[in-house]
Curated annotation (Swiss-Prot):
This is ATP-dependent helicase/deoxyribonuclease subunit B. Its EC number is 3.1.-.-. [4Fe-4S] cluster binds at residues 789, 1108, 1111, 1117. It is an enzyme of class 3 (hydrolase). It comes from the Bacteria. Pfam families: ADDB_N, PDDEXK_1, UvrD_C. It comes from Clostridium tetani (strain Massachusetts / E88).
């Protein structure tokens, strides 16, 4: 029995010394067992290294073991494992069950029990206690003697942990063994084992051990002939006082504990072997790396004056450019310096954040890589399918759970069918019991508030299809849900789940996917999908065994499965031998790395910030240690280990180190470099530093593998297009691509894109007629949309593309409701012979409230009917309408114009025929529309008509907009109405005005207190009619009998003589006629443009406003002013006089 330490700094050859020693023993033909004990993650690589050094004899004579492998070896020899192992998922399920059982008994954790992640946190503390040999009995003893302590929170936590831990142990002992107890059992069983008697053991790659591992080491020291332990340190402590600031503090603490075993058991302590490091064996080819190893964490330190070549720091603009630089440099190393991909490692302290970037960039650059990280099983389609099938029941068929179930990809429903039913469900707000109601869905597909029109045949067919899809979705789920309703045993629950998976043919679908991945050589996916079915079945088996006859419901089952799947990590096999290793700083495997890239070397990432998380705080851990209960280290102690790990990481490679850091993340937030960077700058004043923050790299640096070089080449050609000179090296690149058939074809295709413009070609007239229909019927508002942007009009009305309808209250729907109520109100008082002068606030509120309620009640499928939470919105609508009707009554009462018609329709079934417009070809276009209100005045001067359009949003009147075709609706209606009346009544009728009324219940803000009457007057002003009025003092007076100065009713100010002021929105009869003639001409032009196939992408822009901001089709047109052909139609606001003058000139030309 003897112990010998082999110590030396990182790279000094400690592992190599072990291999040499093992080789010597083999050559001596010793019959003693030769054991190399290493950490679990290093066992495979250590076996490879041992065989590479010693040869095939190593296989038969020496054995590489980890503590885990050692346990299996001993248990096979002397027994010890009589039950099945419980995995992490099983532990989580058992803990979840125990927490439910102890509900009400726990003091601290009662409210935390059902929180996401708490079960895993609880599992971690139990695992920690087991690794540190802390039993429930020891916790109980602590609690018995801790009554005098004042830390009630710690006592409360430990009391809860004791209850959970003891019940956990009682439950697990009956049928299972927790893997965390393996080493404790191993330490005990080693006493019976003969396997290690007289063995020679080398312990390598450890810097510390858990209490369980120390127990095993102590037993090995008692049994083995000799134990050799390597320690990464510059010098041993050997009983001297330990310096708390020593870089090698964690290692020296380990040495101290092992020496305690030696003294306690009277084990022979041989003279340690110190491996010299001048230079360290690993750094024999690099003076720079050797200097860094000695001085990076040394105080005082020595300076290396020469410019560094083996060590370089790269400052990146962001994370993407950082990984792109890394990829280019790796390509350069392999291509120019003779490195193999397997010689290279990329590590980071934030693998979670970097792995997707590394995957994307390395794939683009053609770099083979292996990410040393287990795949989390909870993202697999099978797991999503199982959990969502339960979630659908537990969340009452809500949208998210149903479509997560459908989109897992395991149901026999086509993707198009899922899209069809998803659109329908979103538009109608379908959820809950409506999914499983027996009657067919009959909510309209032609959405809106007007739900009284008969369904068309096409709609009936669509509804039939939707109901067929619904039944395919719901029938298997309803059957499964009925079978697991209520409280049933885990066995019954899992049996029904398994039967459901079989009926849905899930196992064969998984097999099909595996076959699909095999055809594409996706080894990672093959491995994942092969494991996942066994994982799911194993989870069910453990649940049945763990919970036995305990009753549970579907919600509990879902939570247990969630907890179980969260713990599963699927092991992955490296797909090839020659590949770059991508790993985290904590999982870097011990293999010969020549070139190391450390990415994300930012403050808080490398070294990482240690959070004080978990159940026990640092202070509570300290309290436990003071009473003799050893637990895992606190964050302060772990920080020293982090510094040591940083040293180990930075000294892993033998030839080449590249450290990079971004100055900002993807959100633009500034990132600080790690302290490592500043330390490197101190010991290397002439440190190689590069950056792409200011672009300094030459063209040669941009040439790497074909794909990224091709992309860069295309960028260079764009530069040439702009008139800049192209570097000669790109001509050579061009030749290379032209001599490669694959890339030549790609170049020819892409080069055509240089001539790309955003011009939308004119559509053939024949096709236009097919798209818009042979009958030329359209609304005036559609013509206005054509004026805004011909392309948007084409997509909406030609291609019939619509925004996905979502079940919500939209502005157009509210507008329709409000128009319906105003019309009903108007017709109601007309039918009751109530004059507008008689209407008061009380009458408005009463009528409006009743009518809104009736309208909403009749709106089948309306969102305003869906739940009480929309009551506030309904009340707001009522307030707006009540106030609007009150103001309308005042406006009518203040003048001589009286309503003569409401909702006057132009159309085939309307009050008047469609507005017929003859084109230059002789064809006729029929315009349809509706006037909200027509007011009439008859006096000695004749008959005067004004039309009023109600707007639920804000609408201003602008004569410029009429000129540009953006606001022609009212003039078209006025012209048509005057023409119809004149033709039918055979008398002249004059225009009096075209006006908008904005329905609102405005807030009044004042700096002083005002009376109720003053407030009402302010509201009247805010809701005044906006538009164009006849320039006639009598007509103006007839619209506002009380006008004096500014009118409260119309947008007019009168002078003292009664004439309208210069800034009033007025026009004389001649100007009204001019505008009518111009709009007729404009309509002809717009219709002919449309029918000639004009679909140009030319939205208008007025001041800073453009319709693109509210357009549903911007992703289709890809309007961008930097692309040729993408230009706005600029509109300048003109004064009314200028507009009229422009129109006169245009009309003269015609």
């Amino acid at each position: 029995m003897s112990l010998k330490f082999i110590y030396g700094r990182s790279g000094s050859g400690k592992s190599y010394y072990c291999f040499q020693d093992i080789k010597r023993k083999i050559e001596e033909n010793s019959d003693k067992k030769l054991i190399l004990l290493v950490p679990e993650q290093f066992s495979f690589q250590s076996e490879k290294n041992l065989i590479n050094y010693i040869g095939e004899r190593a296989v038969s004579r020496a054995e590489v073991l980890s503590f885990k492998r050692m346990a299996y070896r001993v248990f096979n020899e002397v027994g010890g494992v009589t039950h099945r192992y419980m995995n992490e998922s099983g532990k989580n399920m058992l803990l979840y069950s125990i927490l439910n059982e102890l509900t009400g008994e726990l003091k601290i954790f009662n409210n935390a029990a059902n929180k996401n992640g708490f079960v895993s946190t609880l599992s971690d503390i139990i695992t920690e206690f087991k690794r540190y040999n802390l039993t429930p009995e020891m916790i109980k003893e602590y609690l018995e003697v801790a009554e005098e302590r004042e830390d009630n929170i710690l006592k409360g936590k430990l009391q809860d942990i004791y209850l959970i831990y003891s019940k956990f142990q009682d439950s697990i002992r009956k049928k299972f063994i927790d893997e965390e107890e393996n080493l404790t059992i191993l330490a005990d069983k080693l006493k019976e084992s003969k396997y290690f008697d007289g063995a020679y053991i080398w312990v390598d790659e450890f810097f510390n051990f858990t209490p369980q591992e120390y127990l095993v080491l102590e037993e090995l020291l008692l049994k083995a002939e000799k134990v050799n332990i390597t320690l990464c340190t510059g010098g041993l402590n050997e009983g001297e006082r330990i310096d708390n600031l020593d870089l090698f503090l964690p290692v020296k603490n380990t040495e101290e504990k092992i020496l305690e075993f030696v003294k306690r058991n009277n084990i022979k302590y041989e003279k340690p072997i110190k491996l010299n490091c001048d230079p360290c064996y690993r750094f024999k080819n690099s003076k720079e790396l050797s200097h860094m190893e000695k001085n990076l964490f040394a105080f005082p330190y020595k300076i290396h004056e020469k410019y560094t070549e083996d060590i370089c720091v790269f400052q990146a603009l962001n994370e993407y450019s950082e990984i792109e630089y890394t990829a280019r440099d790796i390509i350069k190393l392999v291509r120019d310096n003779g490195f193999r991909y397997k010689d290279i490692a990329v590590i980071t302290g934030d693998l979670e954040g970097y792995q997707s970037l590394i995957k994307a960039v390395f794939t683009e650059y053609g770099i083979p890589y292996f990410i040393d990280k287990k795949v989390e099983g909870d993202n697999n389609p099978l797991v999503i399918f199982i959990l969502s099938s339960l979630e659908v029941l537990n969340k009452n068929w809500n949208y998210e759970s149903v479509f997560r179930y459908l989109k897992a990809g395991l149901v026999d429903i086509k993707r198009e069918e899922i899209d069809i039913i998803e659109n329908y469900v979103l538009a109608n707000g379908i959820r809950g019991k409506r999914w499983i109601e027996e009657k067919d869905w009959d909510y309209k597909i032609l959405y809106g508030f007007n739900l009284t029109e008969e369904k068309e045949e096409e709609e009936e067919e669509k509804l039939k299809k939707i109901n067929e899809i619904r039944r395919k979705i719901t029938e298997p789920l309803i059957e499964f849900h009925n079978n697991i309703k209520g409280e049933i045993t885990p066995k019954k629950m899992c049996l029904e789940l398994y039967n459901f998976l079989e009926k849905m043919n899930i196992s064969s679908k998984i097999e099909s996917w595996i076959k699909y991945f095999k055809e594409r050589n996706r080894l990672d996916k093959i491995n994942e999908y092969k494991q996942i079915w066994d994982v799911a079945i194993g989870l069910m088996e453990q649940l049945v065994e763990v919970m036995k006859e305990e009753k549970l419901n579907s919600r509990t089952l879902e939570n247990i499965f969630k907890s179980g799947f969260e713990q599963y990590e699927l092991g992955i096999i490296p797909p090839s031998l020659d590949q770059v290793l991508v790993s985290s700083t904590k999982r870097l495997r011990s293999h010969e790395i020549k070139a190391l890239y450390i990415v994300g070397t930012n403050d808080g990432v490398f070294p990482s910030v240690l959070d004080e998380n978990g159940i026990l705080s640092d202070l509570e851990r300290e309290n436990l240690r003071e009473t003799g209960l050893e637990v895992a280290k606190d964050t302060k102690s772990t920080a020293f280990e982090e510094q040591f790990l940083m040293y180990v990481t930075l000294t892993t490679m033998s030839d080449y180190l590249r450290i990079s850091y971004p100055i900002a993340n993807e959100e633009g937030k500034t990132l600080r470099p790690s302290i490592v960077i500043s330390r490197l700058r101190k010991i290397f004043p002439n440190l190689c530093e590069k950056s792409n923050v200011i672009k300094e790299e030459g063209d040669i640096e941009k040439i790497s593998s074909p794909k990224p070089t091709f992309n860069e080449f295309i960028s260079q050609l764009r530069v040439k297009e702009e008139g800049l000179e192209l570097s000669s090296i790109w001509l050579s690149v061009y030749d290379w691509f032209m001599n490669n058939k694959e890339w030549k074809e790609k170049f020819i295709n892409i080069s055509q894109g240089f001539n790309h413009t955003n011009y939308a070609e004119i559509v053939d007239t024949r096709r236009v007629r097919k798209l818009y229909g042979s009958k030329l019927n359209m609304s005036v508002s559609r013509l206005e949309k054509f004026s805004q942007c011909p392309f948007a009009y084409f997509i909406r009305y030609g291609m019939n593309a619509k925004e996905r309808k979502i079940y919500k209250v939209s502005t157009p729907d509210i507008g329709t409701l409000m128009h319906d109520v105003v019309e009903s109100f108007s017709r109601h008082i007309e039918g009751k012979n109530i004059s507008w002068e008689e209407i008061d606030r009380e009458l408005c509120e009463s009528f409006v409230s009743t009518m809104v309620d009736e309208k909403i009640k009749d709106m089948k499928g309306s969102i305003l009917n869906s739940s009480p939470r929309y009551k506030h919105m309904t009340n707001r609508i009522k307030d707006i309408l009540s106030k609007s009707m009150e103001v309308i009554s005042q406006q009518i009462s203040r003048g001589d114009f009286k309503p003569s018609a409401y909702e006057l329709a132009f159309g085939f079934n309307g009050d008047f025929p469609p507005i017929s417009i003859e084109l230059s070809s002789g064809e006729k276009v029929n315009l349809i529309g509706r006037i909200d209100r027509v007011d009439k005045l008859e006096n000695e001067d004749g008959t005067f008509i004004r039309i009023i359009d109600y707007k639920s949003g804000k609408q201003d009147f602008n004569l410029s907009d009429i000129y540009y075709g953006l606001q022609i609706q009212l003039l078209v209606y006025l012209d048509a109405l005057l023409q119809e009346i004149e033709d039918s009544a055979k008398k002249e009728v004059n225009p009096a005005g075209i006006l908008y009324f904005n329905m609102d219940d405005p807030l009044i803000s004042t700096k002083k207190e005002i009376t109720k009457e003053e407030a009402e007057k302010e509201i009247l002003k805010k809701l005044k009619l906006k538009g164009l009025v006849l320039k006639d003092a009598n007509i103006i007076k007839a619209m506002d009998n009380l006008i004096s100065g500014y009118s409260d009713i119309i947008s007019v100010r009168v002078n003292k003589d009664g004439s309208p002021s210069k800034n009033s929105s007025v026009a004389d009869l001649e100007d009204f006629q001019l505008l009518r003639d111009y709009v007729r001409k404009l309509i002809v032009e717009l219709c002919e443009e449309m029918l000639e196939g004009n679909i140009s992408i030319k939205p208008y822009k007025k001041n800073n406003y453009t319709p693109c901001g509210f357009c549903d089709y911007s992703a289709i047109c890809q309007f961008d002013t930097s692309i040729k052909g993408s230009q706005y139609r600029f509109i300048n606001d003109k004064k009314d006089d200028e507009v009229l003058q422009c129109i006169r000139e245009e009309m003269k030309e015609d």
